[in-house]
Amino acid sequence: MPNIVVVDDDITNVQLLQMLLELDGFTVHACTNLEQAMAFTNAATNAFVVDWHLERNASGLDLLRAIRQGETAAKKDTAVIISSGDHRREQEALAAGANHFLLKPYPPDELSKLLASLLSS
């Protein structure tokens, strides 16, 4: 079972994503802030799904950059999906090293399919 860390400061969103991904066979650690995400991250983490906007002026890009710079326990090439309701964030997320950008709202099955595709390649 792939290990996924989902980060969104909206508790309802993070719980919904956790439920949907677990139904599709993923092991999910649901986090509402960067500190929790860092605590759940380890070398067995296969992917991250991170909301762009997080609480306290934090951004999903902060976690993405930390992963890519080797500042977390995850491997530097761990798959990272950034999501946002603002399409203008896509280029910045991809330039920072995100594997994919998901524009919210997206169909419930799209995330699972994308994760399966990223993890199989």
Model regions and ranges:
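Acidic di-acidic motifs
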Residues: 8-9, 51, 85
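Alpha4 helix (beta4-alpha4-beta5 surface) of REC/receiver domains from two-component response regulators
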Residues: 85-102
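Two-component/phosphorelay signaling modules centered on CheY-like receiver
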Residues: 11-29
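Acidic, metal-coordinating helix/loop segments flanking the phosphotransfer/catalytic sites
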Residues: 29-47, 55
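His-Asp phosphorelay/catalytic-motif detector in bacterial-type signaling
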Residues: 46, 72-79
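C-terminal output helix
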Residues: 106-115
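Conserved phosphotransfer microenvironments
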Residues: 50-67
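Hydrophobic/aromatic residues positioned on beta-strands within the core alpha/beta folds
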Residues: 81-83
